């Protein structure tokens, strides 16, 4: 496919979302227009799209075009699409669950759980497969057509030996075969087919009743059939049933169902303050964004007039992970397949996600998906989460105010390096210089956390603001290891 817990712990992630507040009408209309323009420009028969907000679920959605060219049947909200490689995150999270339960280790050798690789795949680890670092050759054209491969034939393929294009563990190279192997590992350690294990752990708890791996589960009147544009007309792609390669790209779902999955991913943020309890399942979801391998650069896909942005990307667990110039930290994945093309994007630190599902071969709706979240961000609707204030930072507010008003850094607990790096006299001079610009700052500061041991203290003063960046040391009691001052002049 082309890449464009325990029940109690899992239940902590499944609180019913609050009533969804719709997007502002003008913004919603702009997103819808962008989706339809992209579909027309790329000759896509039909598509569905959605915008998801953490805690609220699907806040906007739309459909366009036809689900079946021959029957001229339109796409509807309950139309089901294959999502191809967007399946991989379901597989990875299920594997992480099993690891958390002690049924395997991510650094296990693959041969421990799949004996058929003995002799040629002894060096492979589970982690290699998760991050596409197994040394297998990129296999999109071949791998897509392997979806219905039966278990016995897959075993025969593995026993015969698979050639490597490079040594395992060196670099990222996308491999559908690797995720098919993860499906086999899930089967072997759980004792049931990966489809059943994923459905038990993912689909059913989230209420994704319209989601499955098997076309036989889909009423024909609800299926978006797959098409390719060839010789100036639409050609029907053959349907492929379930099989061993479904773990890399076999999920069939609807827009509303997939929105539940996106909301589930977003619900794992923000993380609890260190030392505070949270459901282990939240940390397991966040582990999907823990990438490995050397970062690769990609230009942010867009069809809008936004500024170019180079995004450094690594591969996590079924998700690509990077830092965008506008959205901040992002996770995303495409899904290309004979007859289908899809894309998803989340910005976990602001709590928003978007997705597009289509029924054209290898359609890559990345650009309108990114454009939608960028438009929401630029409209001021998606600020980053405010990090909770730790006791260490909160307790520093009063000492910091004394430091500013007296010039004596001794009013705060100091780490051993603090006065070595800049002595008390120079630090007093720094404070005098900045207060000369700002004037009196009579009230205690506000505090903004960057982490449990890092933050900014800010004072509203007679002439603008004073902002102090404070970094605490990793000591049992709070001690300043760094302190930097800056003055922000008043706005004209």
What are these regions (language model features)?
Residues 295-304, 328, 356-426, 490-492:
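Short, gly/Ser/Thr-rich active-site loops of penicillin-recognizing serine hydrolases
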Residues 408-450:
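Short solvent-exposed beta->alpha transition segments
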Residues 6-15:
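Bacterial N-terminal signal peptides
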Residues 56-68, 121-338:
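Short, surface-exposed loop or secondary-structure junction motifs
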Residues 24-81, 100-108, 151-152, 156, ...:
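Short, conserved catalytic-motif segment at the N-terminal edge
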Residues 18-22:
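Boundary at the C-terminal end of the N-terminal hydrophobic targeting segment
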Residues 333, 343-359, 467-471, 480-486:
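Short, well-ordered beta-strand elements
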Residues 448-492:
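Exposed beta-sheet edge and beta->alpha loop/turn motif
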């Amino acid at each position: 496919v082309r890449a464009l817990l325990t029940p109690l712990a899992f239940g902590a992630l499944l609180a019913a979302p609050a009533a969804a507040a719709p997007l502002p009408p003008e913004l919603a209309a702009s997103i819808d227009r962008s989706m339809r323009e992209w579909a027309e420009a790329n000759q896509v028969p039909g598509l569905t799209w959605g915008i998801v907000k953490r805690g609220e679920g699907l806040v906007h959605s739309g459909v366009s075009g036809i689900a079946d060219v021959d029957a001229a049947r339109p796409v509807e909200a309950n139309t089901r699409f294959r999502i191809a490689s967007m399946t991989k995150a379901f597989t990875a999270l299920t594997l992480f669950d099993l690891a958390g339960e002690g049924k395997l280790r991510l650094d296990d050798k693959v041969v421990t759980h799949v004996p058929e690789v003995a002799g040629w795949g002894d060096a492979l680890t589970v982690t290699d497969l998760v991050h596409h670092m197994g040394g297998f050759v990129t296999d999109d054209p071949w791998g897509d057509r392997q979806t219905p491969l039966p278990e016995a034939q897959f075993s025969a393929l593995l026993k015969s030996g698979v050639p490597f294009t490079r040594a395992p563990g060196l670099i990222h190279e996308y491999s559908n075969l690797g995720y098919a192997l993860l499906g086999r590992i899930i089967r072997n350690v759980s004792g049931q087919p990966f489809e059943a294990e994923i459905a038990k752990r993912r689909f059913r708890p989230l209420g994704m009743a319209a989601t499955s791996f098997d076309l036989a589960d889909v009423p024909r009147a609800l299926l978006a059939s797959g098409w390719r544009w060839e010789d100036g007309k639409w050609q029907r792609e053959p349907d492929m049933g379930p099989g061993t390669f479904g773990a890399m790209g076999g999920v069939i779902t609807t827009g509303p169902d997939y929105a539940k999955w996106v909301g589930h991913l977003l619900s794992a943020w923000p993380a609890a303050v260190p030392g505070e309890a949270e459901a282990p399942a939240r940390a397991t979801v966040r582990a999907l964004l823990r990438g490995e391998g050397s970062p690769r650069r990609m230009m942010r896909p867009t069809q809008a007039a936004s500024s170019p942005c180079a995004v450094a990307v690594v591969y996590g667990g079924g998700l690509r992970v990077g830092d965008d110039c506008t959205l901040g930290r992002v996770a995303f994945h495409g899904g290309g397949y004979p007859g289908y093309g899809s894309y998803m994007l989340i910005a976990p630190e602001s709590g928003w996600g978007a997705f597009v599902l289509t029924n054209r071969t290898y359609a890559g709706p990345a650009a309108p998906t990114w454009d939608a979240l960028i438009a929401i961000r630029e409209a001021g609707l998606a600020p980053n989460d405010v990090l909770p204030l730790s006791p260490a930072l909160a307790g520093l507010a009063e000492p910091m105010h004394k430091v500013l008003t007296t010039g004596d850094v001794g009013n705060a607990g100091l780490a051993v390096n603090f006065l070595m790096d800049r002595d008390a006299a120079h630090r007093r001079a720094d404070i005098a210089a900045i207060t000369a610009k700002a004037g009196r700052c009579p009230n205690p500061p506000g505090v903004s956390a960057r982490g449990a041991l890092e933050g900014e203290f800010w004072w509203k003063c007679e002439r603008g603001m004073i902002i102090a960046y404070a970094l605490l040391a990793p000591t049992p009691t709070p001690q300043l290891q760094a302190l930097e001052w800056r003055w922000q002049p008043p706005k004209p």
